[in-house]
Structures are given as C-alpha cells and as structure tokens.
UniProtKB/Swiss-Prot annotation:
The keyword Methyltransferase applies. It holds the Pfam family Methyltransf_25. Keywords: Methyltransferase, Transferase. It comes from the Bacteria. InterPro entries: Erg6_SMT_methyltransf, Methyltransf_25, SAM-dependent_MTases_sf. GO terms for biological process: methylation. This is Uncharacterized protein HI_0095. GO terms for molecular function: methyltransferase activity.
Length: 251
C-alpha cells in the first residue's frame, strides 16, 4: 500500500473497528449523556463503517441517519447494517457535514466523532453551524475529538500530521468549548483524558484480545510495518502525549 495512506483508513484495513481518539470509553460517555431512547431521531455525521450507529440501534431502537463523504466507508457501513438486520433502523448516504441535506430542526441528537479535528477552524465553524441548524430546540450535539494539552502544540501537530498523513487542527479544552459556545450551544460538558486509540490497554478494551492480536498480526506485515510503527510511536509518545475530548452541548 502507499506510504501516505490516511491513518484511519490504514487502521481500518488492519482490522481496527474503533477509530476514535478516546476509544469506546469516550463514545460510551457520549451515549450515557445523550438521552437516547426509541423515539429519538439521530444523525451521525462521519458514520464511517457504522459501528456506533449499529450499537445505538441495537441498544435503544432509535432511528439513525448516517452520513459520510467516503464511498468505501459507506459501502462497509451498509454491509454491516444488513449483516445486523438493521435496514429499518439505519439509513446511510453520502453528504457533506458543511452542507447537510436535511431540513431545519430535524434531529433530537447529532453525534460526530473524530471528524472536526480534521477541519480547519473556519470549516469547523461551518459544520457546527449546520449541526445547530438541523437540531431541534434543546437537542444535543455529541462530539469526540483530539485535544491539545501542554505548551509544545506545534511539535504535537507536526508529529500527528506525519503519523496519519492528514493535516489536523485539534484545539485545547477551552478552544473546543469556546467554538461550540460561539455557535450558540449552551450547557457544554466535557470528558477528556489521554488518547487510547493505539495504547495496548486501549486496544484490548476496544477490540478485545483476539481483535487486538489480529490488528498486530496485520500491522507486522512488511507493507504495513513502517506506518504502524510510526503511528504507534507518535500516539504513545510520553513527552508529547495526545489527548481526547468528548463534548456534550445543548441547542
């Protein structure tokens, strides 16, 4: 494969199903704070392979609309939805987060994980404004991203960009809270910690022992080894630790 393969696509190819910076633990915090129930209408932006949407539909029986720009991810999501018999609960389509194809005040909950980090600040604001638009009054926005800590932000950003082959723009905790508040959201609550995406403990928690062994086995293949080692080293660097932030905001 190409050496410049985008990080989340690379990890998915290795067999990783949880592709969020705080892993299942952060996603579970969002779900616990999201007020999900059978009668709620949910939008997942950047639904990827449908892992979170499928979990929500199974747990709560809610109807979920999923959007993503990646046709390959959507094809995998559709296959996963059908394999779980959830075609009546989940619908996915290709759409841009900054121009959502939905009417105003259409959803009770919008969930968007590991995407806003990838956008420049102005694009972040456009996407968040769209989430605000399609949410019903008092609706909840649930997000999950990379958070900057410490003082050496430039080194962290450079290391991340080299590791995942994508230009990223994570923010500090105050930066994330501020961008949601500036967009009109209130009651902004956060949960944060060290990134667990590629930590041994986090991988086992997210993927199980056998899933983790499968990922490691694939990672050690000659064509994957260099990029995996680079990502593993960056994501577990003790001097430039990467953090996640999960945010629950109300319209």
């Amino acid at each position: 494969m190409a050496k410049d393969e985008v990080g989340h696509n690379f990890l998915a190819r290795l067999g990783k199903t949880r592709l969020r910076p705080g892993g299942k633990k952060a996603t579970d915090w969002l779900i616990a704070n999201g007020g999900f129930s059978q009668d709620k209408k949910v939008l997942e932006v950047a639904c990827n392979m449908g892992t979170t949407a499928i979990g929500l539909a199974k747990q709560f029986g809610c109807h979920i609309e999923g959007v993503d720009l990646d046709e390959n991810a959507l094809a995998k999501a559709q296959a996963n939805i059908e394999a779980n018999g959830l075609q009546e609960k989940i619908h996915v389509q290709r759409a841009n987060a900054m121009k959502l194809p939905f009417e105003d005040e259409s959803f009770d909950i919008v969930i968007n994980e590991a995407m806003l980090t990838m956008l420049p600040v102005e694009a972040k604001k456009k996407a968040i404004a769209e989430y605000f638009r399609v949410l019903k009054p008092n609706g909840l926005l649930l997000t999950h991203d990379v958070m900057l800590v410490g003082n050496d932000h430039q080194t962290i950003l450079e290391n991340m960009r080299k590791a995942i082959n994508v230009t990223v723009t994570p923010l500090t905790k105050d930066g994330w809270k501020g961008i949601f508040q500036e967009s009109g959201f209130r009651n902004v609550d956060t949960f944060s910690g060290e990134m667990t995406l590629l930590s041994p403990k986090g991988m086992i928690y997210d993927e199980g022992i056998f899933g983790t062994l499968k990922i490691i086995r694939n990672a050690m293949k000659a064509e994957n080894r260099e990029q995996f080692k680079r990502m593993f080293k960056t994501f577990n660097d003790p001097e430039h630790k990467l953090h996640f932030i999960a945010v629950c905001s109300q319209k």
